[in-house]
Amino acid sequence: MKKTMLLNAQLSRCIASVGHTESLTICDAGLPIPLSVERIDLALTAGVPSFLQTLNVVTNEMYVERVVIAEEIKEKNPEILTALLTQLQQLESHQGNQIQVEFVSHETFKKFTLESKAIVRTGECSPYANVILYSGVPF
C-alpha cells in the first residue's frame, strides 16, 4: 500500500503520467466534462470530497508551474478563490517556485479543459470552484 497521501489508483496513475506543461483539471460537481477527456469522478455526495481537499491532495503529488482559473470566481465565489490562492502561495513556498496564475472567462476555461490529461470531478457544490493545473518539473 502507498505511503503517500493519495490513495486513488486512477488519479495516482494520471498524475504520474502528466508531463511538463501538460494539465490536470480539478472541478466542482457541475462542470461539463468533455467525452474526449478522461473523467476521474471522486464525487460521493454534495461537498464530499471538497474542491479544496482534492486540490491539497493533488498538489502534494504534482509539481505545478501554472494554473488557470475562471474569472467569474472573483465575483461568484470569493471565499473559495481566497482559499485557492492561499493554497497556491503555500505550494510556491514548498516547491520553491513561482506559480503563474491566469484568469480567463468560464467559456475559455471550458475550452482549455479539452487539452487536460484528465478532469477530476469533486463533490464541491459551489460556483466556479475549478482550476486547471499545469505540470512543471522539480529540477
UniProtKB/Swiss-Prot annotation:
It is an enzyme of class 5 (isomerase). Substrate binds at residues 28, 106, 128-130. SUPFAM superfamilies: RbsD-like. Pathway: Carbohydrate metabolism; D-ribose degradation; D-ribose 5-phosphate from beta-D-ribopyranose: step 1/2. It catalyses: beta-D-ribopyranose = beta-D-ribofuranose. Belongs to the RbsD / FucU family. RbsD subfamily. This is D-ribose pyranase. It comes from Haemophilus influenzae (strain PittEE). The lineage of its organism: Bacteria, Pseudomonadati, Pseudomonadota, Gammaproteobacteria, Pasteurellales.
